[in-house]
């Protein structure tokens, strides 16, 4: 099963330019991207040789777009997949909007409409957007609702409305400067999608990228509930097949899954929040990682998933780039119980990261603490 997934996660794609980057993101589906450099490193791992300028060009042309969507987390997706994640996210997060903003007079859609209207004419700075909505809620809803905007929960929902795209102030898509927001419908032509239809298509995207997968994996990844996911699987009929895993669990897969790809991509440096972990519900992340080792890659206190090393089809270490003056070094820490990462096998993965991030990596430290 692991090899089936790796073939989809590491497809064979011709070229290393902008169009190849877009094709990769299309194959992978929405990529979780709380860390801005994440998509660049994901491209480096799966399309080694693709450059920083190629990834940036795809962003600049809005061939791939960044928005807060599935499960209220930042994702990068193709322009074609974006309406799907937007539709599903708006539905699944509606109750959170209602509760966090203490809405009584207004419904959620009225508030969202105002967010989109304000961000329609130009790219809005995050602080300006939040202040506008605080004042608007004070006038149209209540003082209590406006006061909720002072807290992180309500303000995060508003600035993270999935109908808004994010972009950096300085063109550096790999840095934490993506504090400009604009309604997606005013950036490119956007046809609204019914959320039930969107969930069907996203289920197909998920199985095509992470399958075979369980119904709980699909529900977790999309942020939707099991009842709706079960209805989708029933609706797909013979477009999906059931498989019985060695663990006795029922898995689902596309009847006609993607072909080709690399069943063993070798050693790769994967980004924070990589799909080999975050593409599955927490109990199912054992496909590529021993669950006893989760605490070595997931820092529960702040919810951060470390960048990880894939070797022989398993996650065996974490890594990070360490700045020392003007130099950048690579620090790798093995996961206890897993094989050590051989220094002589890191050459190509390092070169791929250097090209994708436009950096030069100096020393490699296989013993330095990465936390």
Where are the model-predicted features located?
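Long, low-complexity intrinsically disordered regions
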Residues: 1-285, 289-371
């Amino acid at each position: 099963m692991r090899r089936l997934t790796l073939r989809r996660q590491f497809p064979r794609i011709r070229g290393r330019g902008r169009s190849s980057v877009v094709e990769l993101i299309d194959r992978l589906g929405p990529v979780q991207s709380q860390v801005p450099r994440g998509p660049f490193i994901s491209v480096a791992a799966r399309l080694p040789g693709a450059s920083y300028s190629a990834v940036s060009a795809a962003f600049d042309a809005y061939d791939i777009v960044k928005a807060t969507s599935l499960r209220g987390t930042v994702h990068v997706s193709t322009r074609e997949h974006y309406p799907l994640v937007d539709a599903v996210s708006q539905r699944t997060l509606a109750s959170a909007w209602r509760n966090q903003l203490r809405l009584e007079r207004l419904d959620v859609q009225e508030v969202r409409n105002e967010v989109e209207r304000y961000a329609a004419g130009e790219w809005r700075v995050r602080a300006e957007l939040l202040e506008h909505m605080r004042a608007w809620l004070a006038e149209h809803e209540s003082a209590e609702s406006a006061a909720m905007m002072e807290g992180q929960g309500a303000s995060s929902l508003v600035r993270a409305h999935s109908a808004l795209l994010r972009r950096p102030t300085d063109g550096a898509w790999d840095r934490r400067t993506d504090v400009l927001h604009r309604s997606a419908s005013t950036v490119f032509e956007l046809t609204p999608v019914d959320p039930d239809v969107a969930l069907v298509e996203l289920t197909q995207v998920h199985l095509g990228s992470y399958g075979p997968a369980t119904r709980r994996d699909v529900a977790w990844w999309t942020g939707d509930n099991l009842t709706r996911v079960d209805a989708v699987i029933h609706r797909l009929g013979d477009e999906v097949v059931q498989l019985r895993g060695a663990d006795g669990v029922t898995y689902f897969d596309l009847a006609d899954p993607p072909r080709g790809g690399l069943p063993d991509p070798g050693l790769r440096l994967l980004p924070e929040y990589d799909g080999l972990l975050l593409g599955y519900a927490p109990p199912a992340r054992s496909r590529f990682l021993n669950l006893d080792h989760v605490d070595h890659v997931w820092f529960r206190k702040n919810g951060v998933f470390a960048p990880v090393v894939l070797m022989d089809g398993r996650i065996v270490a974490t890594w990070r780039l360490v700045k020392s003056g003007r130099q950048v070094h690579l620090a790798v820490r093995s996961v206890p119980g897993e094989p050590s990462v051989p220094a002589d096998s890191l050459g190509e993965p390092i070169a791929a990261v250097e090209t994708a991030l436009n950096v030069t990596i100096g020393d490699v430290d296989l013993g330095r603490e990465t936390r």
